[in-house]
């Protein structure tokens, strides 16, 4: 069954964080198939107008990141979509009833869900479809795959994370995810 892996780049660690970008990919967890991708930059000014927050420690952390990641974050603001536009586009990208994966259910999922709440629209997933890569990685601490793309680029991270799920589930065929 087709699933979604998403990643966000945000400017705070709280669930109320302003979102700078959303990246996602459709994938089959039990095969090597990687499908359509989604990547949108979100207007930070518009996020602020919707009450989303910025954290000094996160902004300082971004200052210390790789030049490519920082420039992508900065340049993305030049053509960034309003928050509601980005979320409506992400909702349209998500297949109905699909499992939705992220690296950790304590960061990406609540931040994205809160952004939907802030603009008054429902998330395109149900709570029972939420999946967490961090749990799988914890069960398979020695498995590694080659990384491609830029760290902290939402789309590159989503693709890498989808490949990690595929690799872990293929290596552990007895897991039912």
What are these regions (language model features)?
Residues 115-119, 139, 167-171:
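Active-site catalytic microenvironments for nucleophilic, acid-base chemistry
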Residues 89-94, 106-127:
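Substrate-recognition/cap helix-loop segment adjacent to the acidic, metal-dependent catalytic center
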Residues 99-106, 110-111, 143-177:
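Acidic, Mg2+-coordinating catalytic module of metal-dependent nucleases/exonucleases
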Residues 9-11, 25, 104-105, 110, ...:
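Anionic group-transfer/hydrolysis microenvironments
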Residues 1, 54, 173-177:
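Short intrinsically disordered terminal tails
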Residues 15-17, 140, 165:
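Short, function-defining helix-loop hinge/capping sites that tune catalysis or transport
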Residues 2-4, 9-102, 148:
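Conserved non-catalytic scaffold segment of RNase H-like nuclease domains
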Residues 124-144:
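Short, flexible loop segments at boundaries between secondary-structure elements
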């Amino acid at each position: 069954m087709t699933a979604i892996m998403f990643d966000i780049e945000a400017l705070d660690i709280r669930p109320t964080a302003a979102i700078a970008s959303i990246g996602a990919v459709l994938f089959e967890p039990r095969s090597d198939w990687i499908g359509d991708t989604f990547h949108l930059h979100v207007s930070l000014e518009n996020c602020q107008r919707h009450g989303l927050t910025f954290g000094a420690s996160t902004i300082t952390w971004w200052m210390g990141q790789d030049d490519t990641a920082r420039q992508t974050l900065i340049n993305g603001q030049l053509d960034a979509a309003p928050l509601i536009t980005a979320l409506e586009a992400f909702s349209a990208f998500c297949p109905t009833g699909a499992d939705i994966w992220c690296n950790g259910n304590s960061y990406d999922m609540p931040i994205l869900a809160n952004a939907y709440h802030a603009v008054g629209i429902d998330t395109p997933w149900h709570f029972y479809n939420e999946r967490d890569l961090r749990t799988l990685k914890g069960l398979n601490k020695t498995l590694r795959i080659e990384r491609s793309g830029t760290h902290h680029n939402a789309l590159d991270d989503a693709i890498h994370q989808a490949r990690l799920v595929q690799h872990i589930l293929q290596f552990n065929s007895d897991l039912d995810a």
